[in-house]
Design a protein with these regions (language model features):
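Short Gly/Thr/Asp-enriched flexible loops that form oxyanion-binding sites at enzyme active sites
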Residues: 89-112, 133-135
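Short, acidic/small-residue loops that bind anionic groups at enzyme active sites
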Residues: 105-128, 147-148
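Acidic/polar active-site rim loop that often engages polyanionic ligands
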Residues: 114-118, 131-140
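Short glycine-rich or small-residue beta-strand-to-loop segments that form or flank ligand, phosphate
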Residues: 84-92, 120-123, 137
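N-terminal glycine-rich anion-binding loop in soluble enzyme alpha/beta folds
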Residues: 5-71
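Conserved active-site and cofactor/substrate-binding residues in soluble primary-metabolism enzymes
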Residues: 44, 48, 65-69, 80, ...
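Internal, active-site/partner-interface "lid" segment
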Residues: 139-170
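Glycine-rich phosphate/diphosphate-binding loops that line cofactor/substrate pockets in enzymes
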Residues: 72-84
Length: 170
């Protein structure tokens, strides 16, 4: 059993293979397409999700991951004896998800539920593979034996200097 856990939201767009290979926990966003609400990566595959978006006449709406859901996930980590929890999330300026994770960790520390578990929560300031890529790289580095402090420093440097350019296509 690893003494660390990596967690991200489903906006990171990593492959299911990397998710499984590195034991990364993906917390899904709820997405409303028309009158239907689905949980990304749970109720629908990435390919089917993209197809649904192109067929939907309305702009999809997403719902932030709640503080309550983060507390549930963090409590699971504590129960499993995880020492360090790295959480990498979608741009905090575009979603309240990051703030909810920070609040959940702070509440757990304040009331003692965190125990000795340390939470390292990153606002990626990016979208999609702008934080999915460093998430997988962090997993690779940890599996290769790099220290937690080294990987945390690398992630801080990445998110402090990352620039993301998007190209739209149809």
């Amino acid at each position: 059993m690893k003494d660390y856990r990596l967690i991200a939201d489903s906006g990171c767009d990593i492959t299911a293979e990397d998710e499984e290979k590195y034991g990364i926990d993906i917390m899904p966003f709820d997405v409303t397409l028309g009158s239907e609400t689905i949980r990304e990566r749970v109720d629908i595959s990435g390919v089917d999700f993209l197809k649904k978006i192109t067929e939907c006449e309305e702009i999809p709406k997403t719902s932030q991951i709640t503080e309550f859901r983060f507390e549930e996930k963090f409590e699971e980590c504590v129960k499993d004896g995880v020492k360090d929890v790295i959480v990498i999330l979608i741009n905090g300026a575009g979603s309240h998800t990051y703030a909810n994770a920070v609040n959940a960790a702070e509440h757990m520390k304040e009331d003692g539920r965190a125990g000795d578990t340390r939470f390292h929560i990153f606002d990626s300031h990016t979208y999609s593979l702008g934080y999915g890529y460093p998430l997988v790289e962090a997993a690779r580095k940890l599996e290769a034996g790099q220290s937690m402090d080294t990987v945390l420093g690398w992630l801080e440097d990445w998110f402090d200097s990352c620039e993301l350019y998007l190209m739209l296509f149809n």
